[in-house]
Structure formats: structure tokens, C-alpha cells
Amino acid sequence: MDKEERKIINQGQEDEMEIYGYNLSRWKLAIVSLGVICTGGFLLLLLYWMPEWRVKATCVRAAIKDCDVVLLRTTDEFKMWFCAKIRVLSLETHPISSPKSMSNKLSNGHAVCLTENPTGENRHGISKYSQAESQQIRYFTHHSVKYFWNDTIHNFDFLKGLDEGVSCTSIYEKHSAGLTKGMHAYRKLLYGVNEIAVKVPSVFKLLIKEVLNPFYIFQLFSVILWSTDEYYYYALAIVVMSIVSIVSSLYSIRKQYVMLHDMVATHSTVRVSVCRVNEEIEEIFSTDLVPGDVMVIPLNGTIMPCDAVLINGTCIVNESMLTGESVPVTKTNLPNPSVDVKGIGDELYNPETHKRHTLFCGTTVIQTRFYTGELVKAIVVRTGFSTSKGQLVRSILYPKPTDFKLYRDAYLFLLCLVAVAGIGFIYTIINSILNEVQVGVIIIESLDIITITVPPALPAAMTAGIVYAQRRLKKIGIFCISPQRINICGQLNLVCFDKTGTLTEDGLDLWGIQRVENARFLSPEENVCNEMLVKSQFVACLATCHSLTKIEGVLSGDPLDLKMFEAIGWILEEATEEETALHNRIMPTVVRPPKQLLPESTPAGNQEMELFELPAIYEIGIVRQFPFSSALQRMSVVARVLGDKKMDAYMKGAPEVIASLCKPETVPVDFQNVLEDFTKQGFRVIALAHRKLESKLTWHKVQNISRDAIENNMDFMGLIIMQNKLKQETPAVLEDLHKANIRTVMVTGDNMLTAVSVARDCGMILPQDKVIIAEALPPKDGKVAKINWHYADSLTQCSHPSAIASEATPVKLVHDSLEDLQMTRYHFAMNGKSFSVILEHFQDLVPKLMLHGTVFARMAPDQKTQLIEALQNVDYFVGMCGDGANDCGALKRAHGGISLSELEASVASPFTSKTPSISCVPNLIREGRAALITSFCVFKFMALYSIIQYFSVTLLYSILSNLGDFQFLFIDLAIILVVVFTMSLNPAWKELVAQRPPSGLISGALLFSVLSQIIICIGFQSLGFFWVKQQPWYEVWHPKSDACNATGSLLWNSSHLDNETELDEHNIQNYENTTVFFISSFQYLIVAIAFSKGKPFRQPCYKNYFFVFSVIFLYVFILFIMLYPVASVDQVLQIVCVPYQWRVTMLIIVLVNAFVSITVEESVDRWRKCCLPWALSCGKKIPKAKYMYLAQELLVDPEWPPKPQTTTEAKGLVKENGSCQIITIT
């Protein structure tokens, strides 16, 4: 096998990686060991930081199949390296490892073949992960996932559970009987312990890991260097600061580990009952569960310790831990195609597709429904970190790096500082050699330049603004689990919103119903709760077709179901465990009308009277429920009226879907027109259908019948019209975002015309804007995929800006040409099906549609995630605001995902708002902008601080002098740290503005700002340094120098002079040092004021009272000790006395410096706002962002947007680069 081979694991997935094989080389290891000794351990540190260097330095390439070590590199933009050691799992060591047991193979690496002759589904057994001769399996662990060697694909692959490649039929036929004890033990050997092990590292381990951070190693190097130069006080101060920083970091990291550990520990070890092949029930610990175990769900509920598919019974589950949605969800058993001859056929089981039948790890089972003697059973499909909760925990434990231009530019800037330090390093060596300085002193002073140029406090200073922003967000009810994303939120220029519960109220009000009789719509009716309708099929559907349940006596479930059930005023009763036990079958949920609604006599003949009627009692039992599926956009139930021989099937859902499943002759001919009339007004419309089932369908047959056998050939019954009002604050928030030039997009699962109406009503689409509906059709019957373009236009303005009023907002299709379209704004609207077709067959059109796509309706959860990715691909910074239930993927994928949830923190989203209002979005963007500008300010200040101090030291090195220990201490602690941590306290500006903050440090205006301030500070510092030498009283300073007495200004205490003789050898005390110290101290404060930006992104600096007080105090203190020297202060700071006239001269230099610095910085700001856009427009510079470049192209494209009533077809196969030929048919 080729030793230079490279393979890909997790291909096509988010964690796709390249893999290389290596074997340990003894001679390389010996050379590295020698290098470690020669470098005093530094080489070992370097190899610790760089895993790829470590592997390449100690190993040689080898075939992946036979290697001892694997080197992994992610294929994303970060190209991160990891290494892992190959381990061997010996199956022969297990007591059950007999030839017979070894022949029982795992289907697709996971499923046990319980038959003697494995089918095609079972062709991949355990042997594909092992070598047949020794029965040993080679594997490695990366990010808590085990990857086993697969002989079939000649690559490493992670061991899958029953969640992939297993059909629904196979679930029942091959796995529902349970495992033998031997096979259970065998699988446990492979899958390991079922736990999401979040081990809280020991303090010592965390300490070592933290201390070995390059930043602290550099600080350790600095402290050792300063100590050798007898800068003990400054070195001690840095040590104290580092200890405080390390302790604080350790506390924070350990606290996060403990919180995460406690979150997963709730279900880590519980006792569960499992069914074995011989039908015995065995009680085991949840940690011993393996895929294939049949778990018995207890009657009183439990916290799920794994992912399991329900095969018997019904469960009410709270999934708030995963989704943030507190509404209980009903889970039913997985459909069994093998027992239903009318089913459409078998399908592969998938936890996401079949999530209504899957119990997810960490969720709470509240109640169960069961048959006596037939317990509620679920088959374990995934364990440990493979579960849905395990994957979430992994995303927290091993987050992807934050790809943000600011951080990339910061590293480049640090490299620039290192280069500057290198110049100073060389200059110091040359200057010292020319002055015949001792070798030891040369080495110390040269290295000292490096420690000055790269400021040790930079990382802490950069995070200060984020920490303060996080605290401010917490005060307004926004919680964050990813603080680094706060800065990124400052760059958001597009926000996607879910509709229901986000833009609109959670609750829907029943506006009315419109029933159908004889395939014709009756007049709309407002009141459903009346005697005339109580026994109609329409009301029976409302009473039964829902997923409501009683929890602790309170009716709970989906808000939409609750509103419908409350509207009819019926009563729901559920059987108790005792009542169920008295029967040989599960007791159904029963609904019945209150007595006052039941008519005393037979209703009029024109009412629907298909239901069997009892004179005394009328109630309906819900026999079987097919829960709502967002993919299918419908739900259905099978019910029976008490005393009736036949059962009834009821269905409700999206009108278009329901109509397609009904007999065509029962659907009114004007169905589409009536539906559009309601949806264009912003109403949410739900259709109902019904049919009588055959009498041969018994109770038990219904429990095993497929969904498709029920949901067809229905009778269309009519429409329910729900009014979904906008939240009061929605229009104002969207208006604020529009004023700030932040695009808004609606992503909803609702009807498209309803979504367009709501978008107009809330101001997302202005009345004068055009709406283009893209209807994409997939290839069919040899015809290529195509897109039909329809134009919609609003004739009247919205009736009320804050609610979807009952007055009509009619929408008409525009068929005439729109010559003025280029002069108006336009928006694209499409549904989820069209979006998927366009992604697959019209990839060239996707960027164009993303530029103006505003309404995306009927979107499934995975389509929402794809939309976020498509928007990011054209360089938008995308925010997403949703309820956390169906938006988990999109919330995590967006640059800034914010979930509206009552929970303080949700793993579903980086940000969580306790206030269920989109007002959190502008608040988050404002704080993000403030934090971003703070980071820029702090970085610029720290860069200037290092350059100013670097130049001060370089100047003094030229006369073989330096800053004193306490001078360093005063500058770094009293000035720099105080200024950095107070200048970061500026709150966010009170409103969003159209201007956007810069995204990186490498920009013309920002670089000019920094370079101009560097030149100014160097210039004035040089002026003071060389001018002091020209003074008539100047002389080379020595302990007996007395320039002050020469001018009669001040008499120094002679004892003070005598005490300074011990410092002569360092030449700290001299006139140049004193001059440079005073001027540079003022310069730090000057650039702090110049760089402390206020509006439009932060409050003015004069409102930052801590900063103002700190700067004034420092100014007054430095000015006082400069103009009126205090002997004790001068002695500590090693300042010499200079004539009063020179002190005044230094003050003038400082004042002029301040004037020039602040004036130049203000000019740079004005130049950026006024001249830069003009310069860019004159130069016709190509925008960096793809969407801006695309917008320029489309302005001159005569074929875009598509003309009314045209069709775009995809011609030929999609090419490798994703392009396709487009033809437009008028």
C-alpha cells in the first residue's frame, strides 16, 4: 500500500477531515530528544503547540492500515491539525468470543443478524472492522468519537448505531425481540459505555494546560529576563497579574465544565428495564445500554439515557432541553410497513425524518400510553456521544474556531510588532557592541526590547470589551454561551426571522370557519360552538385531530391545537393507569361535548348526521394518532364514535396538501381562489378532511396500519381561518433595522401568500415594492427542471401597521410588463420545495436570488439551515431569530443565532433572549457593534502603547540608559491597565445607524490612524529627547548634578543624592530619561482619549465616568509631579530634578502633541466618512463582498429580474462547477 496515501473521513459532513498514517521512528525520536535538551525544553513546547510538527518530527509516513499514529487535518477554512494514537481492540479476550458468536455480524456495522442467512442489508459485518485472523480491531478516538478500521472501504469509519442503513421493517423484524446477553456483552465491547462523559479536569491538569499557553510562556520568559536585570518589582507585578489571570481563567473554565457535567449527569446512571430474546425482562444500568437493546419505558416517565425509536405505545415528551420549546410533544410508535399491505413500501429509518417516533437522549418522558401486557417499548438506536444530546455536548466541548477578520488581522498585527521588535533587537545589539557593552548586558537588553514591543496584557485587553458587553446583555435578558460571537454580531447586515411566535404572536385566534357541502363552500361562520354543529364531522375533526394531553390535570400541547379545541368547548378525558389495566387493550383518549351543547332532539336534516347517535351520551374515542410532521405538513387520527361500528379518519394540515389527498369531486372548484383570498389577508388557513374506514379494520389492525393507508381518498370538509396578529413591537424593530441598512428575511413554515401578506404588514416589504414569486418544478417525465416567475402586487396599503387586520389586503397577479421595475425595489418569494429545486438544478441563480430573496415559506428545518449557508456564501453576515424548536440548525449555523426562550441558556443557540420579542435583535447588534469598536480602540491603544514604550527604550538605549523599574511599573499598571479596562466600559449607542463598523484592522483609514499617531508620538518624543540636550544647563547627569540649584528653582536633599549612587551602574537617572518618561506618560493618555470613540456605535467617552475620572486623575497626578516635584515620588520613580523652565517646555510639548493627535484622529474619521466613499466611487473599486459585487452586476443586466409570466429552464446536466445553462421562455 502507498505510504504517501491520504484518505478522507466523514466525507461531506461538517467535521470532514484528511487522514495520514505514521509510525514512530526511534532515530527521529532520539534527535528530537537531543534538541529538547539543547533548547532547554523550548523545542518540546513548540512540538506541544504544533501537533503536525510533533508527528512529522518523531514519525515516518506509513500505510494508514498499518500505522501507529494518525495525523488529522480538517478540510474547512481553518485547516486545523490533530493527532491520535492507534489502539487495538482484541475481541478474543472476551469470554463470548467463540466462532459461533463471532459469526453473528453487525448489520452495516451495527445491526445484529439474528437469522442464519444474512440478507443483503447485513452484508457488512463486524469483520469489516477487523482482521479475520486475529479478530482485532484497530481504532482511534477523536473528539469523543471512535473510528474503527473498515476493511470494506479501506478506511477508518465511526461505528454507527441503528440510525443509518436500517429499514423500518428491519427495526420490527430483526430488532424488536431484543438481544441475547452474549450479543449484548459483545456489542458493549464495541460501543463502550453509554455515557456522555464530560469529565471535569483536575485543577492541576487545567493549571498545566493553561500555563503552557504561549502567552503565559512568553510572560514567564519576560519575568525571568527582568529578574536577571534586577527589575524585581515589575517582574513581581507581572507574576501577580498572571496568577490572578490564571486563577480567574481556571475558575471560569472549571465552572463551565461543572455546569456541562451537571447538565448531562441527570441521566448518566439510571436503572432501566430491557427485554431479552427469551422475553425476560432484565434490569440494568443505563450505562450498559447498546444499540439494539429493547428498552421498556416506565409508566411514570423517565429521562431518556439514549436515543431510541418507539415501537410500542405512545409517549408525551418534554424536549425543552434540546429545542428550548416547552410545549410537550406526542411520540407514537414507528409505522411498520410489513403489516400493512396498503403501505407505499419500506423506507430507511432516520431519527430526523422519524423524529415523531424517536425519543431523544436527555428529553423527559412525562406520560406513557400502553396496552396491558404490551409494554411501551423503544429500541435503542444511538448511545453516548452519538446521540442528539451527545452531538450537542460535543459541539460545546469542541467548538469550531471563530472565523472573524478582526482576529486574523490581530495576528498579522502582532507579527508586525514582532518584526518591529526584531529591528529593535538588531539595533540594540549593534549599538551595544559599538559602545563596548558586556555580552551579558547586550543579551538581556536586546531580549528586553522584544518583551516591550509585544505587550503581555494584549489578550486580556482585547477581551475586556466582550466581557462588559456580555454583562450588559445579561441585564436586558440576553444570555450568551459563545462570547466571541458578540463581536461578530456587530457586523450583522442581514437577519432572518421565523414568523409564528417571533414576528407574530404565539397564540392564534380563531377568526372563523368555512365549511364545504356538496363540493361547495358555505358562507364563513364565526361561532363553532353551537348546537347545530355539535355532531357534525367538521366539529368531530376539531375535537379529535390534535396532540393534546392532560398533564397534572391541565390541558397542554400545541398552542394551535389548544385554540381550536377551546373554540368548540369540548371536554377531553384520558384513562388512568388503573382504568387501562382493567381492559385487555389501551384505553383511548375520549372527547365529548358538554351537556348543554347536546341537542334535545334530532338536528335538522341539512346537518351532517353521518355519526352514529346515542340518545343519552355522545363521545368520541381517539384510537390512533399520526402526529404532525413538518415534512408532511399534516396530521391525522383514527377515531370512533361510542357505539358506532365503523371508525373515522380525520386529517388536518396545509390546505394544498390536504386538498391533494382528497377525492377531487369533494374539493370545491373555487378552492384556490377562496384560499388565496384568506392567505393574502394574512390569515393562517388550515384544511380539514374525513373519511369512513372499512368495518373490517379492527382496533389492533389500526394500531399497525401505515399512515399512507389512512391519509388518502378523503372527503374535503372545509377550512379553519386563524388570525395571527403581529407582535406590537415588530414593525418598529424592522423599521429600525431597515434604517440601519440591515436586510430582513422571513423564513417560515407557513403558507407563502400568508407570509407575503405578513411581510407587507410588518414593513419587511414596502407597499410600493414588487414581489416576484419563484415556482420551481423538478425534472419530470423527461422534462428538465424549470422556474415559473409570477409577479404579485398589492393594490391597497396595509390597514394597520401593527396587526394583521381583518380587512382585506388583496393581492393580484400582474401580467402586464413592468418597465419601471428597474427603478423600484423587488423581492423574491418562494416555498421550500422551490428552494430545494433551485439549489439542485439552478446553482447559478442562487446568489442572485439570495440578493433579493425576502420570503421563504413552507421551509423545513434543514432547508432553513441551507438558506443560512446560501446567504453566507455571498458574504452576508447573517443573524437568525427563532423560537429554537424547528430552527436549531439555522440558529447554530448563523453568525449570530438568537433563540426566544424562557430558558437562561440553550444549547440550541449561541444567544437566548428571555424576552419573547425581536427587540432583542437590535439590542444584540448594538452591543456587538459597541464591543467591536471597543476591540478596535483597545487594539489601537495597545499597539501605540507598545510602540511608544519601544521607542522610549530605544532612544534611551542610544545613551546606554533605560526606563527605571518603577517607571515601567507606573506606566504598565497605573496608566495602561487602568485606561484599558475603563475605556472598554463605554455602553452601546442608543440606536442603530446606517454606518457599519469596520470588519478588520487592515483597512486604509484604520492603518492611517495608527501610523499617523505613531509618527506624531515618535516625533514629539524625539523632540523632547534631543531638545533637552540643547539646554544651557544640560550636562551628562551624575549623582552630584544639580540643574535645579543652578536656576534657583529647588533644593534637593543631599541625603537623597547620596542614596542614588547605587543606581549609577544602570544609568537610569538622567535628564533624557526624565524628559522621555514625562512626555511618553502623557502620550499614553493622549492616544487613549484620541482612540476612545463614541457615537455612532458607543456612548460618548465623557459618559464613561470611570474612564473620565481615571484619565483626569492620572493627568493631574503626572502634571503635579512634573511641575511640583515631590522628593519621595521622584526617588521611587528615579526622576531627576530639571529646571522649572524645562518643565513648562515639556508641558507645551505635551499640549501641542495632544492638539495634533486629536485633530489628526478627528480628520481621519471625517475623511473615512466623507472622502473615502467618494474616492472608492471615483476609482470604481470592486467591492470585496460578493453580494455587493453581484448587486453592481445586476444593475446593468437587462435580463434581470425575470420578466412577468416567463419560465426559466435548466438545459443539460449540471456541470462539475455547479453551473448550468439557462434558457428563458416567454
From Swiss-Prot:
Keyword hit for Translocase: yes
Any Pfam family hit: Cation_ATPase_N
GO molecular function ontology, one term from the record: ABC-type putrescine transporter activity
Lumenal side: 227-232, 431-448, 962, 1021-1073, 1127-1143
UniProt membrane topology term: Multi-pass membrane protein
Location(s), subcellular: Recycling endosome membrane; Early endosome membrane; Late endosome membrane
GO cellular component: early endosome membrane; late endosome membrane; recycling endosome membrane
Residues annotated for ATP binding in this entry: D498, K499, T500, F628, R684, D750, D883, G884, A885, N886, D887
Binding site for Mg(2+): D498, T500, D883
Catalysed conversion reaction: putrescine(out) + ATP + H2O = putrescine(in) + ADP + phosphate + H(+)
GO annotation terms (biological process): intracellular calcium ion homeostasis
UniProt keywords, alphabetically: ATP-binding, Endosome, Magnesium, Membrane, Metal-binding, Nucleotide-binding, Phosphoprotein, Translocase, Transmembrane, Transmembrane helix
Protein family membership: Belongs to the cation transport ATPase (P-type) (TC 3.A.3) family. Type V subfamily.
Listed name of the protein: Polyamine-transporting ATPase 13A3
The organism of origin for this protein: Macaca fascicularis
Originating gene: ATP13A3
